[in-house]
Amino acid sequence: MAISSAICNSFKQEILVGTHNFTASSGNTFKIALFTSSASLGAGTTAYSTSNEISNTSGSAYSAGGATLTSTTPALSGSTAVCDFADVSYTSASFTANGCLIYNDTNGDRAVCAIAFGSDKTVTSGTFTIQFPTADASNAIIRIA
């Protein structure tokens, strides 16, 4: 099992039929769920599942299903459409995560993208932050060129 960073194939088709709305004030609710190294996430992932989702080693910083993302309305960076989210922090956290899945909580928990952290990331009684990259044509977490 492994996590590989990819825009999910199902998402590519679903945006063409209007399944996903990233508009900040009136769009769908998107969430980010964290997973262990035993998870299998990547381009073929179609929906969120609790299988191999992380659990707290102590405390209650992380809840099943993950955190709700705050999005900015999609924009153009040159000729590339980009979408961005506010960084997510889990405070007083104790857990280990190897990657995550962004998914549409409004529309059937459909997968948007999987992100591999490159290795296990562990936090013990601290703050675990997911920092999203700059929302431009080269770096945005979701880009359509």
Which ranges hold each PLM region?
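Small cysteine-rich, disulfide-bonded extracellular modules of the LU/uPAR three-finger superfamily
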Residues: 1-98, 105-145
